[in-house]
Amino acid sequence: METESGNQEKVMEEESTEKKKEVEKKKRSRVKQVLADIAKQVDFWFGDANLHKDRFLREQIEKSRDGYVDISLLVSFNKMKKLTTDGKLIARALRSSAVVELDLEGTRIRRKKPLGERPKDEDERTVYVELLPKNVNHSWIERVFGKCGNVVYISIPHYKSTGDPKGFAFVEFETKEQAAKAIEFLNNPPEEAPRKPGIFPKTVKNKPIPALRVVEEKKKKKKKKGRMKKEDNIQAKEENMDTSNTSISKMKRSRPTSEGSDIESTEPQKQCSKKKKKRDRVEASSLPEVRTGKRKRSSSEDAESLAPRSKVKKIIQKDIIKEASEASKENRDIEISTEEEKDTGDLKDSSLLKTKRKHKKKHKERHKMGEEVIPLRVLSKSEWMDLKKEYLALQKASMASLKKTISQIKSESEMETDSGVPQNTGMKNEKTANREECRTQEKVNATGPQFVSGVIVKIISTEPLPGRKQVRDTLAAISEVLYVDLLEGDTECHARFKTPEDAQAVINAYTEINKKHCWKLEILSGDHEQRYWQKILVDRQAKLNQPREKKRGTEKLITKAEKIRLAKTQQASKHIRFSEYD
């Protein structure tokens, strides 16, 4: 009994050790690639090319006395978040870095060498690329341009509103020679591309950019249509194949199966069966899907049988003959090659060699497809800068002409208002009086509404009041309303009228209003009225003090031009009504 219990304990111990080993194996994590990616990313951030352009990181280094930056700052970057959020793992990855070094605690890093001055030949080493794919990223550009040399920095501008790439990028190389090589080898713009290079998109702030996804969706729809058509063609071919197979199977079934029937059959019956077989062969060869290249007679028989038929069938027959001739040529070549190989060695060895050759050819074709020419336009940055200057000069000229046209339109409109039918002195005096009244009204508006007692009516409802427009319309049917102070969902509101008489008229018409709406109406007076007038002034001041977007330069001109264009279109679209007497 003791021996049995001892054996059981040993078995249990062995099982537990095995389980521990399995757990240890599972715990082991492979982080070589992650460590390499972390080291590469941090080396780029602290490299000369990036630090000369990255103001934020440069300021963080300059703030510290020793030039150290906390690893927690790197963890806050989005690209590092994708790799890891563990500071210890980052420290482990940077131990053998050639660009940065760790402090004694392993929580901070700094550059090994101090940052020098910005190189003067930066623009000469940089190339401008356009006609990029819509979903372009840094890794794609690095893979394409890495063939020409060591890529130091990549800049892909994006739209702020949508986040889509603008369709161009800047690639900085290590040397001028590498940049020149990239311009020489990768500058292959397609025929459809515009003649002049350079994309200078100018969009108004907060204005939606024409979505690129719409174009992509259209392309996807086209692809789907193409696939559907292909599938339909394949189905049609399969149906044709099925019909041909069924016809062949029918002919096979018609043949005699028993041996007794074969002996009893006469010679004329054999001749008929031979003719039927020939017809079957002709039918099989007439189908474009089933190619029988070895049987040359079938194609000639097809030509003889299909000659008296219609023109459409003749065209089909020509295509079939072409296919048959191509297949026969291929077979001839194979026959010649097999005859030569018979002299040299066995047929099996030759077939193996042929298959190998075919595989090699396929692989070569695939490699060629992989090394296809990418349709890009590549220029030097200095050339792009010249194009940018040209574009800005054109923009300046166009804006100047737009400014002139706007001023001309304004002057013409003023002339039209002033000129017209010759006016009397009395009419002129009336005009001047009206102008003075307008000026006084403008002054009043500038100071705000003046205090008038008995003008404000308070409206109370058991349910939430309808919209401001509906309240205004119901009150305006009785007397003129200047303003309705109402927030959405409120049960109380205030209406301001022009004169106390107008407010009193609304109170008098309470019975009419109460039929449609269950409202309580009262004119404010005393302290309540004074408090409300103070509220009006405070609200007005708050509204005036709100920050406004200042439109300047090209934006201001474009908005003015748009307003003029809209006014002209509205005038043009007006319906001209003729009276009965015209």
Curated annotation (Swiss-Prot):
Residues 219-228, 354-367 have a biased composition (Basic residues). One of its GO terms (cellular component) is cytosol. Pfam families: La, RRM_1, RRM_3. Residues 450-563 form the xRRM domain. Changing residue 483 to F: Does not affect binding to the 7SK RNA. Changing residue 130 to A: Decreased RNA-binding. The keyword Ubl conjugation applies. RNA-binding protein that specifically binds distinct small nuclear RNA (snRNAs) and regulates their processing and function. Specifically binds the 7SK snRNA (7SK RNA) and acts as a core component of the 7SK ribonucleoprotein (RNP) complex, thereby acting as a negative regulator of transcription elongation by RNA polymerase II. The 7SK RNP complex sequesters the positive transcription elongation factor b (P-TEFb) in a large inactive 7SK RNP complex preventing RNA polymerase II phosphorylation and subsequent transcriptional elongation. This is La-related protein 7. It comes from Homo sapiens (Human). The gene is LARP7.
